[in-house]
């Protein structure tokens, strides 16, 4: 194990790490997909807009739904709150040589990517042809005045259907 917290990606070689900690997508493929989808109109219901309006400290959270490019962090634990969000930002920065931009959390993408990269090692898939589409149905931090517990247990507006609709349209 390491003797002190890693500050830059090079520090990771002094501790325990595996090659399935981070996955980079093909930038050209990502940019191609973004160019095709960046102007897709994603509808938002009144209840979704009302929920978003609570996030007075986050201008992006209050915007209508939009297509963007960013990084996700996979974890086996469903987490929320400012402290863990800070940790997630640090983790993404560390594993991306300070280039990553943490946007969303997820649980399944690391498993999917691990499987695809293992298949790539035996020439069954081309990992350079992988794209991941994420839609957001909730936030990793609560709005001002709410707790992380509230954030983790708040009902999704319209039961998360807006995220499904966004995935279909994009």
Spans of features found by a protein language model:
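Accessory terminal and edge-of-domain segments that mediate assembly/interaction
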Residues: 1-170
